[in-house]
């Protein structure tokens, strides 16, 4: 789907660029269809696929008690890559850009200061991001007492948010490179917000306003 969207976008741009030229309809169509030389390989949908696929494999093959250690390893390892590879600079010397150009080719990257926001290396912390979500989901399924569930979820959210902002003094919160602190803070805020929704809807019973959002909640990838 992601590659299809990227191709369609390139098709439209090529079609529009040929609108003023005196060529036949079939020639214009052919040149617009065969635009794979500059198609962007990675994107949001592709990242979702990579992260969900990696998380599924890890969840099926690794003992779940070791997943938190893997999350820490992925985030720390990625931070070391950023520090040693000029990863916080928006230029061609950035390790993220270097790897993407070497593997994907510059013609197949998102053109934004040499950095592809959905590049290969930045998928590492994104996988850790999804793994944190897996751990939170596992907690929600295993803990039956709703009060204990809320306490643990609020605690996790608070700790992650505080830790992320604290670490941001040495590792800036940056979505474009998907910095470790960005993953930690967003997971913390998301966990806290989820706990708040559970408290409002399941504990207090204010459910009528949430009916509209149920379809989005149970079908997020389809939407």
Language model features with spans:
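Alpha-helical transmembrane segments and their immediate juxtamembrane cytosolic regions
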Residues: 1-223
